């Protein structure tokens, strides 16, 4: 099952990261503005948020097996749509379709991991997160290489349908051997929407992932603009996601206590160093800034999921909180690339964007101090 989880995780980001290295060509071919081009990343991320908010309904009405299978099919179809000549409506439709598939899977998987790997939740959550980040790195690194070996540059984006199909068959075979899905499990109902902590977690998760979403949308374009090649710029994004994968594996493994604040603070400091490097010394040590920023972003992602799961020992309740956190968070994160595009149009460069995210990280450090685990059991409002 772990191998299948990794295969599925590898398909969660290439639809987003494969676009970045080709964004200048896509803009030129389709006539998109910076703000519209940003929607290629923003739209699927916002869609992830909407589907995460619907996670509770999906959990009750659609079997785990079918929801993941349908989602992988949607990701494959979304990638295949990019086989055609790039037009704004077509590209945005493919982003929306893929975002639906990604959103459903991300709403389902945390509670699946907590239920099936209860004694190893931090390690498996780290592995799942590392697979997400690793898939993003593959999308950024392999796409420019495929362009060099393809007669039609834009059709290389459609190749990312293949791993989704492989994961679909692997999941369908493996899930047939598993016991009945958890959507039939009953627990004490809890209204997470009415708790201030749930909203705090949502904003926290959103601001962290907003930095990631802006980087995968604009980091290659930023370096192309200041003189780097498309191949080199895509490689920097791949190195950032390699750092993310390392952070996603290492930091949850270091989380031996329920208090996640020290590790979260470390992850945020690394992000701040990376964004400051992009602002002041972008061409001097680009590999270092990309790796350090990725390490912080990758470590923060699974730690946020663990932080939410820590709030209840019941997988269904914890899963409901994670779904709400991801829902609000991904909607916020999805606005970040669009806002970055607006800042780019206003200022003429990307420095305002990196400065904005650096300020967000400082705010996140202050919020982190509030996550004392001793208060977790007191934070819920039960339904009558």
Swiss-Prot record:
Q: Which GO terms describe its biological process?
A: cyanate catabolic process
One CC-aspect GO term: plasma membrane
PROSITE patterns documented for this protein:
MFS (PS50850)
Q: How does the protein associate with the membrane?
A: Multi-pass membrane protein
- MF-aspect GO terms: transmembrane transporter activity
Record keywords, A-Z: Cell inner membrane, Cell membrane, Membrane, Transmembrane, Transmembrane helix, Transport
User: Its domain of life?
Assistant: Bacteria
Q: Which InterPro entries match?
A: CynX-like, MFS, MFS_Cyanate_Porter, MFS_dom, MFS_trans_sf
Look up keyword Transmembrane and say if it applies. yes
Q: Where are the transmembrane segments?
A: 3-23, 34-54, 68-88, 89-109, 122-142, 153-173, 204-224, 235-255, 263-283, 287-307, 322-342, 354-374
The places in or outside the cell where this protein is found are: Cell inner membrane
Q: Which NCBIfam families match?
A: CynX, PRK09705.1
State the function annotated in the UniProt record. Answer: This protein is part of an active transport system that transports exogenous cyanate into E.coli cells.
Task: Name the protein family.
Answer: Belongs to the major facilitator superfamily. Cyanate porter (TC 2.A.1.17) family.
Return the protein name: Cyanate transport protein CynX
State the organism named in the record. Escherichia coli (strain K12)
Q: Which gene encodes it?
A: cynX
């Amino acid at each position: 099952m772990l191998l299948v989880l990794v295969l599925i995780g590898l398909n969660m980001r290439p639809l987003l990261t494969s676009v970045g290295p080709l964004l200048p060509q896509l803009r030129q071919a389709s006539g998109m503005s910076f703000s519209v081009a940003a929607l290629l990343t923003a739209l699927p991320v916002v869609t992830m948020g909407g589907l995460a908010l619907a996670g509770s309904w999906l959990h009750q009405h659609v079997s785990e097996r079918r929801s993941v299978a349908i989602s992988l099919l949607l990701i494959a179809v979304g990638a295949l749509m990019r086989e055609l000549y790039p037009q704004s409506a077509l590209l945005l439709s493919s982003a929306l379709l893929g975002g639906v598939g990604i959103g459903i899977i991300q709403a389902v998987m945390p509670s699946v991991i907590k239920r099936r790997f209860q004694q190893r939740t931090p390690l498996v959550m780290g592995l799942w997160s590392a697979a997400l980040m690793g898939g993003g790195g593959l999308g950024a690194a392999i796409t420019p290489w495929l362009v060099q070996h393809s007669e039609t540059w834009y059709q290389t984006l459609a190749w990312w349908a293949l791993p989704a199909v492989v994961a679909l068959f692997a999941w369908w075979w493996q899930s047939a051997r598993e016991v009945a899905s958890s959507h039939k499990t009953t627990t004490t109902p809890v209204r997470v929407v009415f708790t201030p902590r749930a909203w705090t977690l949502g904003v926290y998760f959103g601001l962290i992932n907003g930095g990631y979403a802006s980087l995968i949308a604009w980091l290659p374009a930023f370096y192309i603009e200041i003189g780097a090649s498309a191949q080199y710029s895509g490689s920097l994004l791949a190195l950032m996601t390699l750092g993310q994968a390392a952070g996603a594996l290492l930091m949850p493994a270091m989380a031996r206590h329920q208090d996640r604040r020290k590790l979260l603070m470390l992850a945020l400091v690394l992000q701040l160093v990376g964004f400051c490097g992009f602002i002041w010394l972008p061409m001097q040590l680009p590999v270092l800034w990309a790796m350090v920023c990725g390490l912080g972003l990758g470590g923060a992602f699974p730690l946020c999921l663990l932080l939410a799961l820590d709030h209840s020992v019941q997988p269904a309740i914890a899963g409901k909180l994670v779904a709400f956190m991801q829902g609000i968070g991904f909607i916020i994160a999805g606005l970040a690339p669009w806002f970055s595009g607006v800042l780019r149009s206003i200022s003429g460069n990307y420095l305002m964007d990196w400065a904005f995210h650096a300020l967000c990280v400082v705010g996140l450090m202050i919020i982190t101090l509030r996550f004392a685990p001793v208060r977790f059991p007191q934070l819920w409002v039960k339904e009558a």
